[in-house]
């Protein structure tokens, strides 16, 4: 049996000094020999998705200790992508994922912790912790802070649901008065929690359920609802059990790499496609798979996207449905249940909470069970009161939405679309692929051709859109915003939001080697690989070149002959692969270090040391 890692610092005469330091943290004689569990928190007052986590780490810690473990809490950083958006702060968002993964590794290995509970929530925090968990491969349970309630505002004599994106779009739309913009701003983000739609944070927290590393309801139970407290309490007890099973019973089935296998990654991506998750999840799953030493690639995502239907449409794809509605319909277990019915999942694999996913679905899918407890759990409703306090309300719907024909979650037979919610496109513009969230694309523009309007940065694109330089039929092309070229692969939420505000959301396309916020929708194609800074063809496109987009056939093509492309490449090789215009962008040493090691989006934008 493997020895407890913590014995390195708690046992032996030579560790008297280390034990002395442990005692100074509150440990007593009877604690030496118990599993030491790292409570990896991410509380910060900068981020609404994390503002309520301060006391939740200690809640988990108390449960760990009541179950016979020793809990030691530490914190990671957490960047709010919405606040960092639209300025140079966004350069730091994706690189922060690597810092989070590294910081977890540093703390856990430096102190020889035996297992972890990861308390995450927002965009880069869940992926960073997931990467660390698979890198370390010690028992882990994920529990996130939970989704925000959707905002609501009285608009033209009716109540309209809102989220962060509505505020951004309204601010750039001249049809809205200042008073109307303020009303939307005040209502868009009413509570603590991760932004209320199927944006990156909620997408990733949902995927931890499919990967088998979190408890049912983790992705969809509202941050404000009292039901969410149970997830934290159970996580504390569960992690002690998992640690004992591994270290005392030699049960390797509880390790992250035994749970998050290739099949589990397929399940997670299948879920992502079915629920129209954020395109950022592609980056993060590819990165996590590499940490797990699993050969899960863009080719696998492409394969899955061709056979998985869209079973759930959530904001930003539709404005009336948010995470609270997904939970009301049975949450992620409800979507996984329909995917299983369609034969699209591998359910023989284990989870942290059940022997197999199949058994978990039998217990937690509201269409399979009559359990009063399960149906009550998924009836949790928004409280409708602005708050930054977790577990502060107990409102419920009268009953769960089990309508799989016209409800929020559909069966395969009644799918919103038989074609998946995410697609990988290939062509001479993106030889290694690019990603589009098809769930957010109007059917009328699934095939689109138009002239390229070239911008060497997100900033210049925003000015071009707001100044009326973009016309219906144009393709906005933003380059040198990839992992290396940015550096940091900025999100393009402002350009997509401003296209909407100008009435161009269904009349234009946007292509970039950067990425998109989970809040983006429309014909927004990102992650173009290779990126411009790596010599990708996107760096050779010139103003007015025609680009053909064919989502049904998964193609993207620059309509320029090969000889001309070769001539341009030779010219660019001589001039150097850099933006044609100078950008007023301060690149710090930290960002330069990331850029020096960053790989392409097709590889998850992870770091790779030079050979």
UniProtKB/Swiss-Prot annotation:
The active site is at 517 (proton acceptor). It comes from the Bacteria. Keywords: 2Fe-2S, Amino-acid biosynthesis, Branched-chain amino acid biosynthesis, Iron, Iron-sulfur, Lyase, Magnesium, Metal-binding. Binds 1 [2Fe-2S] cluster per subunit. This cluster acts as a Lewis acid cofactor. One of its GO terms (cellular component) is cytosol. The modification N6-carboxylysine is found at residue 124. The keyword Iron applies. Pathway: Amino-acid biosynthesis; L-isoleucine biosynthesis; L-isoleucine from 2-oxobutanoate: step 3/4; Amino-acid biosynthesis; L-valine biosynthesis; L-valine from pyruvate: step 3/4. Mg(2+) binds at residues 81, 123-124, 491. Its cofactor is [2Fe-2S] cluster; Mg(2+). GO terms for molecular function: 2 iron, 2 sulfur cluster binding; dihydroxy-acid dehydratase activity; magnesium ion binding. One of its GO terms (biological process) is L-valine biosynthetic process. It holds the Pfam family ILVD_EDD_N. [2Fe-2S] cluster binds at residues 122, 195. It catalyses: (2R)-2,3-dihydroxy-3-methylbutanoate = 3-methyl-2-oxobutanoate + H2O; (2R,3R)-2,3-dihydroxy-3-methylpentanoate = (S)-3-methyl-2-oxopentanoate + H2O. Its EC number is 4.2.1.9. Homodimer. NCBIfam families: ilvD, PRK12448.1. Functions in the biosynthesis of branched-chain amino acids. Catalyzes the dehydration of (2R,3R)-2,3-dihydroxy-3-methylpentanoate (2,3-dihydroxy-3-methylvalerate) into 2-oxo-3-methylpentanoate (2-oxo-3-methylvalerate) and of (2R)-2,3-dihydroxy-3-methylbutanoate (2,3-dihydroxyisovalerate) into 2-oxo-3-methylbutanoate (2-oxoisovalerate), the penultimate precursor to L-isoleucine and L-valine, respectively. Belongs to the IlvD/Edd family. This is Dihydroxy-acid dehydratase. It comes from Brucella suis (strain ATCC 23445 / NCTC 10510).
